[in-house]
Curated annotation (Swiss-Prot):
Its cofactor is [4Fe-4S] cluster; [3Fe-4S] cluster. SUPFAM superfamilies: 4Fe-4S ferredoxins. The gene is fdxA. The keyword Membrane does not apply. Residues 2-30, 31-60 form the 4Fe-4S ferredoxin-type domain. Binds 1 [4Fe-4S] cluster. Binds 1 [3Fe-4S] cluster. This is Ferredoxin-1. It comes from Afipia felis. [4Fe-4S] cluster binds at C21, C40, C43, C46. InterPro entries: 4Fe4S_Fe-S-bd (IPR017896), 4Fe4S_Fe_S_CS (IPR017900), 7Fe_ferredoxin (IPR000813), Fd_C (IPR022569), FdxA (IPR054829), RnfB_subfamily (IPR050294). [3Fe-4S] cluster binds at C9, C17, C50. It comes from the Bacteria. Keywords: 3Fe-4S, 4Fe-4S, Electron transport, Iron, Iron-sulfur, Metal-binding, Repeat, Transport.
Length: 93
């Protein structure tokens, strides 16, 4: 099992999840974060930290697309280990 970042993160990027991840498995794109599925240890501490409710366990239904997105982009986006400010317009999304 792994956790998956879903569409609710797009344009939000609050990054509270990054601060609590014990294995630094988050990767940052321009508009969202993703979780590297092979690095995630399934601890679940990130899920309740996300104010956008964008993080879900991959055991939930209909997450195949987002699991693929996370796996693909985690290979190329830079690793993020410290929280940054959310975009100024994050609350609009």
């Amino acid at each position: 099992m792994t956790y998956v970042v879903t569409e609710n993160c797009i344009k939000c990027k609050y990054m509270d999840c990054v601060e609590v991840c014990p294995v630094d498995c988050f990767y940052e794109g321009e508009n969202m974060l993703v979780i590297h599925p092979d690095e995630c240890i399934d601890c679940g501490v990130c899920e309740p930290e996300c104010p956008a409710e964008a993080i879900k366990p991959d055991t939930e239904q209909n997450l195949e697309k987002w699991l693929g997105v996370n796996a693909e982009y985690a290979k190329t986006w830079p690793n993020i280990t410290q929280k940054k400010d959310a975009p100024a317009d994050a609350k609009e999304f």
